[in-house]
Amino acid sequence: RGHWMYYGNARDKLGGIGAHYQDPPPAYQITVYDPAFNPPDFLREGIMYQIFPDRFHRSKMPVAERRDRVLHSEWNEPPYFIADDRSGDNWALDFFGGDLEGIRQKLPYLKDLGITILYLNPIFQARTNHRYDTGDYMKIDPLLGNEEDFIRLCEDARQQGIRVLLDGVFSHTGEDSLYFNRYGNYPSLGAYQSKESPFYSWYHFRKHPDNYASWWGIPTLPELNKADSSYRHFIMGPAGVARRWLKAGASGWRLDVADELPMDFLRELRKAVHRESKDAVLLGEVWEDASNKIAYGQMRSYVLGDTLDSVMNYPLRDVLIRFLSHELPAQQVVRQIRSLQENYPLPFFYSLMNLLGSHDRARLHNLLVRQDYAHLPNAQRRGLEMDKHLKELATERFCKMVSLINALPGMPCMYYGDEAGMEGAADPFCRGTFPWGKEDRSTQDFVREAFRLRKSRPVLTRGFLELACEGEDTLVIHRYSKDGKDVFGQPLDDAPYTL
């Protein structure tokens, strides 16, 4: 009898050199994408900066328009955590008054830092400070300013070589919204109020009015019916949300919880934004390898050229944090990055949003020394700071992570204040105010110089990538051009990007 041997994907299923098997092996992934797919150059060549608008800079002392909002008079005090009785989540009703004009005033700082793309967390009218509970998609939250302020911000930013991306929250709204209107705070007949509401079909009611589908079971965030034609027209029509704010000056959308949006919704949205602007981008919040993600039983074709231009590169971020924390050997870092490189179309891989920090996790400085205080109740995490030794170690590792991100394909993304040394546990304490006048100047200088180097070396945005490791603690990144004229990389003993 003959004996069959098979050759297939490596046993960790990360591609590269395969393995022999006696039984049918795991297959390699083959990604077939639209050959015309080509995200705009400003993604590939960009350096991004994420801003949580309430916490970056305020141009004036705010005035509360609602009685349920708490305004901080002291800019530098920590955010509050007050639990919602229904969900246990933070109420998020304390505000510091950061605004769009405040961001505009700091454009010179951002330009000097090397930033070319601003990603703003939600700016539309909402109840909370994070504004992921949209109240009115067509109106800027009054605490942030108005449409004229947004237009002025985009115009001035573009004059300084900076584009603006908005956060699109199209999976759910707030219960306190023009569309749901649970509390009657808006001048509309909301879906909660009546089955005769023009917005009733936008939601999934099991039994009207109190039994309805909500995002992850959080009752303050009623889930939208993305299949509803009137809702789709509202978002994607000629005068819809997506195109309206592109007309006002935005260059694209970061899509919150992209996995919650049906694939045909994303395809239609892509067509809509391209009707408005051919270089408008869609960037998705996806936490895993976006080339083979399955959500709600459906394969997500994020990377094939018909939906997204880019995603948030959480897999890379997680791998680098573990590596710098001595929890993952360099060999595994190389395996993980090569797997993404192998699975993603080249235009997609070079346009990834390589985030450092995030509004959804503890501050990067904390994570790099495992000081996220997750073992403590939320109320006890407020205002905690690391001791001098841990802070120095965190800063050292942070600078190394900036160096690594800087040398890899994709656009680095700095979460506001990380370059200034900000600390903080998870939400809401990772959303503190920018420490103007109290920044870590040496870290700021390091980041500024790193980004200057990236912008001055085209090989770092367009060059080929080779990875190697020497032992468990040394990762070597080599970037080179096809003709060999522009090479980035040095011997191990003095390489600035060798860790």
Q: Whereabouts are the PLM-identified features?
A:
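The feature marks proteins involved in alpha-glucan
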Residues: R1-M48, R58-W75, F81-A83
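Carbohydrate-binding surface patches
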Residues: A468-L499
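Aromatic- and carboxylate-lined catalytic core of secreted/periplasmic carbohydrate-active enzymes
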Residues: F434-D473
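Substrate-binding/active-site clefts of carbohydrate-active enzymes
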Residues: M48, F52-T116, I123-A248, L269-R275, ...
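Active-site-proximal helices and loops of the catalytic beta/alpha 8
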Residues: I151-R163, S171-H172, S177-S188, V241-R243, ...
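Conserved, mostly hydrophobic/aromatic
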Residues: I51, L110, L120, Y137, ...
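Aromatic/acidic polysaccharide-binding cleft in carbohydrate-active enzymes
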Residues: D54, Y296-G297, V303, D309-S310, ...
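Hydrophobic faces of well-ordered beta-strands that scaffold small-molecule active sites
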Residues: I47-Y49, L118-L120, V164-L166, W253, ...
